[in-house]
C-alpha cells in the first residue's frame, strides 16, 4: 500500500485511550450520566470564509454552547488547503486543487481532517435539535444512512483518527480526479455514493439516518430520535453567499475537474 501521508505511519498501531467518564446532567436524549469517550472531542466545520452569514453564525454559536467541552474549529478554504498540504502527499493536494465544486473540495477535506485528528465533522447548515449534545456520539464511530437508503450521508461523520474507510475514500478521490471520473450521479466522485464502496449501508456503525422533508427541514436521527436539524433560512443564505455554481450543475455540465 502506498503511503498516503508525509508525516503519518499507517502501520503504527495506536492504543485507544479511554477518557475518564464525563458527567452530563439534564441530557434530554438519554438518562445516562456517564460516558466512556473514545472519539476525540473535536468538532470540525467549513465555510469558504470566516465571515459567516448571521443565521449560520447563530447555528455555530448554538453548537458551541451545547458542547462546551469540545474543541471547535471552523476551517475556511485556505485552512482546508493548508491542512492537506501539511499532512498529505502532493497527489492529494493536487486532487484538492483540481476539484472545481466547493462541495467536492469540502468532501475531500472532511475525510482528511478526520483521518488526521479524529472527532466529529458536521455540515455548517445543521444545528443541535432540542439541546442534543455530541457527547452522545463519542463512545464509538458513527455514519449516517442517506435519505434514499442507498448512500452514506457525509454531512455528519464521527471518526477515530486513522480511519481506514476515510483512507480509502481519500485514495479513491485522488484516482477519480486523475481519471476525471464522473460516475452515474453527482454524489459519486467524492460523496455519499463513493463512501458505499468502503462501508456497507448495513454496517452496524451506520446507525444514524438522514430524513429530508424540504430544504429547510432536513433532520438527522439517532436511535429514532431527531438530534440535528438544518437551521431555518440556510438555503437562502447559502444561495446569496455562494461563490461557485452548485456541484450538481457543474456535474451535469461535465465541469467538475480542472
What kind of feature is each model-predicted range?
Residues 1-106, 122-258:
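Glycosyltransferase-associated regions of secretory-pathway enzymes
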